[in-house]
Amino acid sequence: MQHRRPTLSPIVMALLALCLLCCACAKSAPAAAPAPSAPADSVQESPAPVQVSPAPVPSPSPSPQPTPFSFVWMTDTQALSYHVPDALDSMGDWISAKIETENIIGVFHTGDIVDNGFKSWEWDNFDLALQKFRGKIPFYPVAGNHDIGVRAQNYEGYTHCDFLNDFPPERKFGDGAVFYDLFSAGGTDFIVLGVGFDATRQFEGAFDWIDAVLQAHRDRVGIVLFHRYMDGKGETFKKSRENQERIVAANPNVRLVLCGHSSGVSTRYESYDDDGDGTAERRVCAMMFNLKGSASYGFLRLLRFDPLSRSIEIVTYSPYRDCYHVNRKTGESLDFTVEKGF
């Protein structure tokens, strides 16, 4: 009897083939690497902290230095207003041109602006200078004896001058025969007081008004403008002694006095004991300036204020002659410095 081999059905064979294929794939796949384990006694360290430097503290900015400033001082221009208008024209041009470079903040005039205050054409001549800087910087004029008429001695003509309208009514007495103004420069507060020729004699109550003004502004450095105060030798005129006693001596804030009228130049330092302790603690610098003669046409003074040293440099110059003034006999310059002048 012939035996036949048993045969697998097609279905069984297919299942066997599938099983063999799956086993082969499982053997060929790489095993996943086990996660490394830390030793039992190890301690995981925290990340080192990031060092943050503190922001630098900015250095304080240095305090700004106070700025020097200047005033122009004109005086006794009567001869120029009478017959040398070209000199006034050059003075006005120079002042206007130097406003920025010299930091000019005002123009003083200590009187005798014209030769005869009742002649309008002389005021027109002075306008050649005035209109070059008026409206740009303040103009501080006081009347001289020529401005009110040498014989008439009447303020009526002078007080009608238009430039006095630059002062508000409350800052004028006698329609402008006396005035004051306030300004600040170089870190210092100032008051400028203008007292016209014999105004304290002609206008009743002038001394009381002046005293009230200076007392109300006692914390400001006082600059006083007179026409007549002292002569070329530095001596007080007899008729000016009351002004000296009741204005300059009586008010501790007055530090500078400017005047004209007499001939030449002079400087005097006055000392006052304001607190009555027997020691003079206040010094006032008084200056007279009035150069005469054709060789001196057009001279003015530039006053340079230094806020750090508190000094005032005095420069004497003529834009008309384009020269600085020197003593013709000695060759000595008229320029000097007032130490601790304000």
Question: Where do the PLM segments sit?
Answer:
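Active-site environment of divalent metal-dependent phosphoester hydrolases
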Residues: 80-82, 115-118, 143-152, 176-179, ...
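A short C-terminal boundary segment appended to hydrolase-like catalytic domains
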Residues: 301-342
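Active-site-proximal beta-strand elements of phosphoester/diester hydrolases
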Residues: 68-78, 188-198, 223-227, 283-291, ...
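N-terminal active-site segment of His-dependent metallophosphoesterases
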Residues: 38-42, 48-121
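Extended active-site neighborhood of metal-dependent phosphoesterases/phosphodiesterases
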Residues: 119-208, 267-289, 300-304, 334-339
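C-terminal motif of bacterial Sec signal peptides marking the signal peptidase cleavage site
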Residues: 21-24
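Bacterial signal peptide processing site
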Residues: 26-28
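His/acidic metal-ligating clusters that form di-metal
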Residues: 96-106, 135, 189-274
